[in-house]
């Protein structure tokens, strides 16, 4: 008799957010990101914009302007990383406070 392998349930890659929306769709994820942490997409857009302006300056042969925009890119990228790290810490703190509210009797 042949052995049959056990049926393994599928892995769910995303969970519904606190508002109940499923974040599997790209538009849902973007809306969630813009609503919860708006500085991250703004920083990403600033980074890309600075890089595009630097590229345009290089094509025109304006190396001083290109260097200035590359510096702006580094600043925008650093601000974005700080926003990500700050968002992680804030979210962790909010989860801890929520957990403490559930544990602490009123």
UniProtKB/Swiss-Prot annotation:
InterPro entries the UniProt entry points to: Hypoxia_induced_domain, RCF1
GO cellular component, one term: mitochondrial membrane
Keywords in alphabetical order: Membrane, Mitochondrion, Transmembrane, Transmembrane helix
Localization of this protein: Mitochondrion membrane
Transmembrane segments: 39-58, 73-90
Source organism, top-level taxon: Eukaryota
Keyword Transmembrane helix included in the entry's annotation: yes
Disordered: annotated segments: 1-28
Ranges of compositional bias, category Polar residues: 16-27
Bilayer disposition of the protein: Multi-pass membrane protein
One family name in Pfam for this protein: HIG_1_N
Domain HIG1: 9-102
The keyword Mitochondrion belongs to this UniProt entry's keyword annotation: yes
Similarity field: Belongs to the RCF1 family.
Function of the molecule: Cytochrome c oxidase subunit which plays a role in assembly of respiratory supercomplexes.
Assembly and oligomerization: Associates with the respiratory chain complex III/complex IV supercomplex.
Protein name (record): Respiratory supercomplex factor 1, mitochondrial
Gene coding for it: rcf1
């Amino acid at each position: 008799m042949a052995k049959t392998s056990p049926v393994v349930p599928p892995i769910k890659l995303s969970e519904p957010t606190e508002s109940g929306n499923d974040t599997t769709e790209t538009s849902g994820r973007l809306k969630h990101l813009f609503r919860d942490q708006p500085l991250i997409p703004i920083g990403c857009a600033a980074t890309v914009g600075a890089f595009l302006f630097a590229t345009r300056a290089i094509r025109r042969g304006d190396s001083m302007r290109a260097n200035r925009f590359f510096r702006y890119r580094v600043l925008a990228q650093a601000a974005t990383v700080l926003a990500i790290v700050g968002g992680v810490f804030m979210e962790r703190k909010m989860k801890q406070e929520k957990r403490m509210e559930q544990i602490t009797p009123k």
